[in-house]
Amino acid sequence: MSKGASAPQQQSAFKQLYTELFNNEGDFSKVSSNLKKPLKCYVKESYPHFLVTDGYFFVAPYFTKEAVNEFHAKFPNVNIVDLTDKVIVINNWSLELRRVNSAEVFTSYANLEARLIVHSFKPNLQERLNPTRYPVNLFRDDEFKTTIQHFRHTALQAAINKTVKGDNLVDISKVADAAGKKGKVDAGIVKASASKGDEFSDFSFKEGNTATLKIADIFVQEKGKDALNKAADHTDGAKVKGGAKGKGKAAAKAAKGKKLSAKKGDSSAADVRKSVDKIVKYTPSKGSRKDTPQKSQAPAAGKSSAKKGGKKAVPSAPSPSGKKSALTTDKMTMAQFVKYLDWHEKKKGGKVSSGGKVLGKRSAGKASATSGKASKASKKTAAKK
């Protein structure tokens, strides 16, 4: 493929059809005949809403009574409400433009809905489709919503040109002169249509009126009323809620949730405070930890220090030592060593001279034995003489 050539852009069939309808002022007869071909669709959902997709967007088809009867006559063993994940071919169809309440109909926008009316269709049970993307609501597409807004704006311009003429236009100069005086607020407002409130509804298109069946009626026809009630219990009557009532309920629900979360937060905070109080109660302070003997320092059983009411032993002063270092043992000089010996002998009761010898205390052991041998030798020498 050359640089200048580009791959053909794929487009949604539903988006193209519905856009053509709005661009032709809602007149289906003006839609190109090349687009009016059978539609092969994938059924995204069959109850409580019947939704079909072209792989890009989903829309809601509306079945006529004739289409449902024909389907049941040709396919008696197949239910329309059981076509989820199946493929259907819509042979005969048309498009209509309706004015609806978008707060209740989710397949609409700005109170306008383009409806796919099904006159004849059949299932294609042998074919299976695997969508490569998740389809979204066509009426939530930004580009398509812009198309609907343009349609509304064009209708509003047409209504203004039809009702407002030069004779009934307000003289702006008179309105400006009366600005400083008391007057009506709507003195400079020109009413362009008979719409009530701020919602414009004076459209010139011909609204469709083809009769169709609700999917709930088709469900009852195929499975009975009891099955419908059971299905309604499972789905809880799914509806699109909106408007002031819906907002009020949502706000009340949110406020209730905040109160419940606040109560939960208070109870959890109280539990945390109780746990902290217990820990503080049973944790000894720094002072008590100093006096409390550790396992390795616990006195032996039977000693007087372990008796109740005994005096606490006053710790003695530490022995003199050298400078502390993390790299090696204590560095002790000779003077410090002499001081250590003096301290040690004072503790035992003796005295040490500057040379390090013990004064005023007779040594025991080998020294006494040597002195005894020397005295015997001297006696023998004297006897020989």
UniProtKB/Swiss-Prot annotation:
Q: What ranges does the record list as Basic residues composition bias?
A: 242-262, 376-385
GO terms (BP aspect): telomere capping
Query: What segments bear the compositional bias annotation Basic and acidic residues?
Result: 263-280
Q: Does the keyword Cell division apply?
A: no
Keywords, alphabetical: Chromosome, DNA-binding, Nucleus, Telomere
> What GO molecular function terms would the record report?
single-stranded telomeric DNA binding
Q: Please provide one cellular component term from the Gene Ontology annotations of this protein.
A: protein-containing complex
The region called Disordered is annotated at 231-329, 343-385
Q: Does the keyword Lyase apply?
A: no
Bias type Low complexity, positions: 295-304, 312-326, 365-375
The record's listing under InterPro entries reads: NA-bd_OB-fold, TEBB, TEBP_beta_dom_sf
User: A Pfam family name for this chain?
Assistant: TEBP_beta
Please explain the role this protein plays, according to its UniProt record: May function as protective capping of the single-stranded telomeric overhang. May also participate in telomere length regulation during DNA replication. Binds specifically to the T4G4-containing extension on the 3'strand and protects this region of the telomere from nuclease digestion and chemical modification.
Please report the name of this protein according to its UniProt entry: Telomere-binding protein subunit beta
